[in-house]
Amino acid sequence: MPKVRTKDIIEQFQLELVSGAEGIYRPITTSDLSRPGIEMAGYFAYYPAERLQLLGRTELSFYETLTPEEKKSRMERLCTDITPGIIVSRGLEVPPELIEASERQSVPVMRSTMKTTRLSSRLTNYLESKLAPTTAVHGVLVDVYGVGVLITGKSGVGKSETALELVKRGHRLVADDCVEIRQEDEDTLVGSAPELIEHLLEIRGLGIINMMTLFGAGAVRTHKRISLVVDLELWDPEKQYDRLGLEEEKVKILDTELPKLTIPVRPGRNLAVIVEVAAMNFRLKRLGVNAAEEFSARLSDAIEDGAHDYD
């Protein structure tokens, strides 16, 4: 099933449907828009017919200089069986030749009162959001001090319990158990909860808890950009864990790499506090403060000074 149809665009931007009503269920498969200026001049060799077509004052003022035969020909070639729609901006008058051609090909022709550039920008942002690559990850997403922290790990390791403690400490839950992730940009991943389990948290022994009902609207968020991955794993005595923080792990989700911390779980460790500190430390690093690197530099200086003393 297509993610976006022309009907969705009409409803989202309150567009006036002028003609071609039979085609409002056509799928929109790309976030790219086309302003067919060169096509108005008669060059259709590289006409991107699969895109939404946007006609502004520039295109329509040139169109008015054409002969009646040219006008009819241009609009007939503009309306194809794969064109999802044609939008006229600025509330301009829709050419009768376009209405006739669109009715024959069932191409929706819409009109907006917005300026062309603003409409183009808003359409692109909307389509990029809706058509972005998506995936689902088993984990919990929490907003901790403004940092989107994705908590992962095997079932039963304590992800939901950690999220519950974080919410109790004033942070906000985004999703539990299943996190839907969409890639809105090359380096931007946004996580949200499936509609069915939105605001719900499952705790073994307690069952399902509605966090918004229990803690209020301030305890939940609908979506959040993911900045950090915290992987919880049962403590393995055979494994060497990072104790300085100089080595930064990365994990790839879709086409975006995110910093990852592996936190060993054992009785007595307060995981919620550790996740809080991890989020604060992440913010510090973004501000250019890296405690591990500063300690390493001081240690190197001390060793070097000690070596000189022995000399």
Curated annotation (Swiss-Prot):
Entry's family note: Belongs to the HPrK/P family.
GO terms under biological process: regulation of carbohydrate metabolic process
Positions of the UniProt region annotated as Important for the catalytic mechanism of both phosphorylation and dephosphorylation: 201-210
Enzyme Commission code: 2.7.11.-, 2.7.4.-
Protein name: HPr kinase/phosphorylase
Region Important for the catalytic mechanism of dephosphorylation, residue ranges: 264-269
Metal-binding in keyword set: yes
Keyword Manganese: no
Binding annotation for ATP: 153-160
Domain of life: Bacteria
Catalytic activity: [HPr protein]-L-serine + ATP = [HPr protein]-O-phospho-L-serine + ADP + H(+); [HPr protein]-O-phospho-L-serine + phosphate + H(+) = [HPr protein]-L-serine + diphosphate
NCBIfam families xrefs: hpr-ser
Active site location: 138, 159, 177 (proton acceptor), 243
UniProt cross-references to CDD domains, sorted A to Z: HprK_C
Annotated gene: hprK
Extra remark: Both phosphorylation and phosphorolysis are carried out by the same active site and suggest a common mechanism for both reactions.
Gene source species: Geobacillus kaustophilus (strain HTA426)
Keywords: ATP-binding, Carbohydrate metabolism, Kinase, Magnesium, Metal-binding, Multifunctional enzyme, Nucleotide-binding, Serine/threonine-protein kinase, Transferase
Cofactor(s), by name: Mg(2+)
Function of the molecule: Catalyzes the ATP- as well as the pyrophosphate-dependent phosphorylation of a specific serine residue in HPr, a phosphocarrier protein of the phosphoenolpyruvate-dependent sugar phosphotransferase system (PTS). HprK/P also catalyzes the pyrophosphate-producing, inorganic phosphate-dependent dephosphorylation (phosphorolysis) of seryl-phosphorylated HPr (P-Ser-HPr).
Binding annotation for Mg(2+): 160, 202
UniProt-listed Pfam families: Hpr_kinase_C (PF07475), Hpr_kinase_N (PF02603)
